[in-house]
A protein has these predicted regions:
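Residue-level detector of conserved, well-ordered beta-strand and adjacent loop positions
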Residues: 26, 94, 102
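Short, high-confidence coil segments that cap the C-terminus of an alpha-helix
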Residues: 47, 74-75
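A generic structural signal for alpha->beta connector loops
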Residues: 20-22, 74, 146-148
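Catalytic-core segments of class I nucleotidyltransferases/pyrophosphorylases
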Residues: 49-51, 58-71, 83-86, 97-186
Length: 186
């Protein structure tokens, strides 16, 4: 699909084969934080659970498993938790002597928000359309305190793309035919 907003606000469909998805692109404001952005799209959502992603993470999250867990949990929001590997290796030490090197283990107990979420429309009650509303602060913290925030623990591949280094790593995986997130033919 090509969207051409330069003159005629035209959409061109290049192939007739498509998933049964509804995609809405909304300008929520250049300086609007994450919570304000979600609140500003409320009128497009409807009454069903919806999926949200930040768009700067690449993963092989099983979206069906995420959705099924969300539905069975009764939570308002279910986020995908991941355990990122350490960026730096760990030194094994005995006193002032290095005795070995190893990668930082994922299993150090720390989980982070991987950025793939399922939300019930009830989440809008926790959000403000103001530019400064940050989803990860007051809204998600309130849901957590109320026991309404769930986690889907994703054991598979996840990589953020925040830096040129991240971009280069992901491109290297793709170009080498080792992209765990690739589904189907491209």
């Amino acid at each position: 699909v090509t969207f051409d907003f330069s003159q005629e606000n035209r959409m061109t469909v290049h192939q007739n084969v498509a998933e049964p998805w509804r995609v809405t692109l909304v300008d929520t404001g250049l300086n609007t934080q994450t919570g304000g952005r979600v609140k500003r799209v409320q009128k497009y959502i409807g009454s069903e659970p919806f999926m949200l992603t930040y768009g700067d993470g690449v993963s092989n999250v099983d979206l069906n498993a995420l959705l099924n867990q969300h539905r069975s949990s009764g939570k308002t929001v279910t986020l995908t938790g991941i355990q990122p590997g350490g960026r730096f290796g760990v030194l094994d030490l005995e006193g002032q002597t290095v005795t070995g090197f190893r990668e930082k283990a994922k299993e150090d107990g720390g989980w982070i928000n991987g950025g793939f979420m399922v939300m019930n429309p009830e989440v809008f009650d926790y959000l403000s359309p103001e530019e400064r509303c940050i989803l990860e602060r007051t809204p998600l913290e309130a849901l957590a305190q109320e026991g309404k925030l769930g986690i889907y623990k994703h054991p598979g591949f996840w990589q953020c793309m925040d830096t040129q280094r991240d971009k280069n790593r992901l491109e290297s995986l793709w170009n080498g035919g080792n992209a765990p997130w690739k589904v189907g033919e491209v």
